[in-house]
Amino acid sequence: EHINFMATYGRGLICLSISETRAEELKLPLMNPDNWKKKTTAFTVSIESSTNITTGISAFDRAETVKAAINPNFKSGDIVSPGHVFPLIAWDGGVLTRAGHTEAAVDISRLAGLNDSAVICEIMNDDGTMARVPDLIPYAKKHSINIGTIQDLIAYRIKNDLLIKKIPEKQHQIKNIYSDIFEFNVFENTIDGLHHATLHLGDLSKQDSVMTRVHPVQGFDDIIMNFNNPKTKDLHASIEKIKSHGSGIIVLINNPILGDLGKLSNDEKVKYYGLGAQIPVSYTHLTLPTSQL
């Protein structure tokens, strides 16, 4: 019934989002391995159930293929290629690793306590163009479908999933260029393994609010305080403000793509600023504001 609805009212390509683990179990090769490296949509070869189907294209046949592909008791021999269902591999970590529809579908299924897979389909308008938000709102009302955004899902997971792990052995004191002693801590992102750091002054656990800056690391510009870089200049101003206040924290987010946050999508900004907000929360039970210094 659902496959038939997608084919009739969705009109786009019907795909099956699955986890990396399940793709390995089924021994499904990527259609284009380069897509995985570039974090673009990871299509595998198309598939078909090896039993209980006829042509493979009917709604019933495609539903049977989906059921076979997600059934943990079924192995690679129960699936053949090519076929009429198109699997997509979701990155481990979901939308917090790649802000895509494939990952969003698997995340929602997991959050609902269901199998970590989902059938997805892009929606086309009657004239053959792709449906956008203004088209989707009346569409959702007509068919009684809820609407959600990847950005909202990212925000929900950041709020509810603990992504940051403190690395105690990296803890030590350093002096900044102002000769003030800041405590230096290193944190690991449990999703992608990247390390991030903090510089904090004072006991943050006893404060009602904490002066905070989330700063995308600017490399050598930050080291030499190159004020021609406006972000490094902002970092300097934040250090001065924390010094004057007597306490506060600077969260140093380490990621090569963060050199210019202005070029990131809203989804990526939510992800990285949300990550930055989780780190100071680990110092205290307080819920910190997401605004920057």
Question: Which functions belong to the PLM regions below?
Answer:
Residues E1-L286, S291:
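Catalytic domains of riboflavin
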